[in-house]
Amino acid sequence: VGFLALAYPDAKFFYSKRDARATCWSNYETAFAEGNFYSHRLEDIVDHYNRCTRLMQFWVDLFPSQIYTFDYEKFVSSPTIYGPDLFNFLNLDWSPFYLEVSRSTTEVTTASQFQVKEKIYSGSSDQWKNFILRIGTRFSNLIE
């Protein structure tokens, strides 16, 4: 981020934040490609999440006018408000059609390949709560 922000002072960056517990649980449930061994243990995921969060906060503090912190929960609850805000930050035109992701025929090859073909919804952010007994205190050190 730093090199790009300095090399391209007009560059804009999009930083998507989601509930820390939902993010960590989603990582735990996902079978990532080889080399992502941190995602096999909740303790390692929490450590990885915290390191990423601290690093991103460093960049946000250093380049506040170039980095847009996008609140995932706010977006899924009010996409017609928060979608246009992001596009405005990026100096792009907004269209309500962008919210009709379930109509897209574009191939998706990410861990979210099935979810992105559905309508925007907020239910996945609470899935971790179904496993609270299994999770125990593993999320107690999370940075929000």
Show which residues each predicted segment covers.
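Conserved adenosine/adenylate-binding substructure
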Residues: V1
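Conserved phosphate-donor/acceptor-positioning beta-strand/loop module used by diverse small-molecule
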Residues: L4-Y28, L86
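PAPS-dependent sulfotransferases, especially Golgi type II membrane carbohydrate sulfotransferases
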Residues: N27-T69, S77-E144
